[in-house]
Amino acid sequence: MSEMTPREIVSELDKHIIGQDAAKRSVAIALRNRWRRMQLNEELRHEVTPKNILMIGPTGVGKTEIARRLAKLANAPFIKVEATKFTEVGYVGKEVDSIIRDLTDAAIKMVRMQSIDKNRYRAEELAEERVLDVLIPPAKNNWGQAEQPQEPSAARQAFRKKLREGQLDDKEIEIDLAAAPMGVEIMSPPGMEEMTSQLQSMFQNLGGQKQKPRKLKIKDAMKLLIEEEAAKLVNPEELKQEAIDAVEQHGIVFIDEIDKICKRGGNSSGPDVSREGVQRDLLPLVEGCTVSTKHGMVKTDHILFIASGAFQVASPSDLIPELQGRLPIRVELKALTTHDFERILTEPNASITVQYKALMATEGVNIEFTEDGIKRIAQAAWQVNETTENIGARRLHTVLERLVEDISYDASEMNGQTVIIDAEYVSKHLDVLVADEDLSRFIL
């Protein structure tokens, strides 16, 4: 898990997300508290429960982006889900328990990659020996079995040197590689994951672990052999246990669009399959329960839950009281201003303007955004948000795409040219659309 301090986490988020300091501080503290808890003695560690977070703010202000960037920083099992995808138990649709199953699968993948990286040096040595065995087959005894010489021959050592220096990379060899397992996808009813897993294993193991000869360049063969040898060095049972432990102690679940499962005012007939029912099903997960997965039982007592929603129609008080109580930290994200839009266009690493410049540079076209051009783009996006639906920073993508549409279309014929996007250029291409509310509604 990450050992970054809250200040370091916020600093890293600042590289990609403009403003929203309160939200950044909250997630940074929550992430650091995961590390702090692990420094306590076992008895006290068990008593410290995570302080779950509810992020409230209009669409397009950075809620989902914070989650996306946090996933990369956490170095822990992390999953982002949409609350609207789930239905109450007993109805057609995904159950909320599948969140923990997916989180466990993510942890298995993460721990496997870490184990493979840990064993990579040994795997490279074994892969190298297999390639050398093909290039210089070892002598065989009377029974046709390969003999292991006391010391490597001079020829083998010479080939090893060439192999490490990359002189043999383009030479083709035929080598035996493990055949890909038979892919069998089985749709299982809820609660039957273990049986499904066993059936899949049975089908995959039909005929045993076959090896298939393949003709490859040495550099490609080495990559596949390293993966194969590294996988052999990983203990599946230890891997499962380590992954389950990582989920239970460090797991983070981000639930987006939680406002869409609030019970809205007014009388509604029929069962509330995907709203209040889902909240009731979420409650045990957030409070702490045990979920059965194909890898084993997973306790959710110390998993951190971060929920977010726009709450434009509903309000946080429309969530069921028990769920409100389990999301004690409330953070409000502010609507973006024109100044924020200007910063979004220029400050983040790989900002939208940098992306467009890089895309056009592949065709030999140089795009330059002037300061007044950036200001005019920001004003246009903000103005359209005010007069139509406010979709936050996402409006910048729409405006910029419209702005560079002609350049994108003609780029292949503009090799070597420079296009200056200043206030005049922006006004020429966008003013008519921005001024006409009907056109803005349908085009921008």
UniProtKB/Swiss-Prot annotation:
InterPro entries: AAA+_ATPase, ATP-dep_Clp_protease_ClpX, ATPase_AAA_core, Clp_ATPase_C, HslU, P-loop_NTPase. Gene3D superfamilies: 1.10.8.60, DNA helicase RuvA subunit, C-terminal domain, P-loop containing nucleotide triphosphate hydrolases. Coiled coil: none annotated. One of its GO terms (molecular function) is proteasome-activating activity. Keywords: ATP-binding, Chaperone, Cytoplasm, Nucleotide-binding, Stress response. It is found in: Cytoplasm. It comes from the Bacteria. ATP binds at I18, G60, V61, G62, K63, T64, E65, D256, E322, R394. GO terms for cellular component: HslUV protease complex. PANTHER family: ATP-DEPENDENT CLP PROTEASE ATP-BINDING SUBUNIT CLPX-LIKE, MITOCHONDRIAL-RELATED, ATP-DEPENDENT PROTEASE ATPASE SUBUNIT HSLU. ATPase subunit of a proteasome-like degradation complex; this subunit has chaperone activity. The binding of ATP and its subsequent hydrolysis by HslU are essential for unfolding of protein substrates subsequently hydrolyzed by HslV. HslU recognizes the N-terminal part of its protein substrates and unfolds these before they are guided to HslV for hydrolysis. A double ring-shaped homohexamer of HslV is capped on each side by a ring-shaped HslU homohexamer. The assembly of the HslU/HslV complex is dependent on binding of ATP. Belongs to the ClpX chaperone family. HslU subfamily. This is ATP-dependent protease ATPase subunit HslU. It comes from Klebsiella pneumoniae (strain 342). The lineage of its organism: Bacteria, Pseudomonadati, Pseudomonadota, Gammaproteobacteria, Enterobacterales. The gene is hslU.
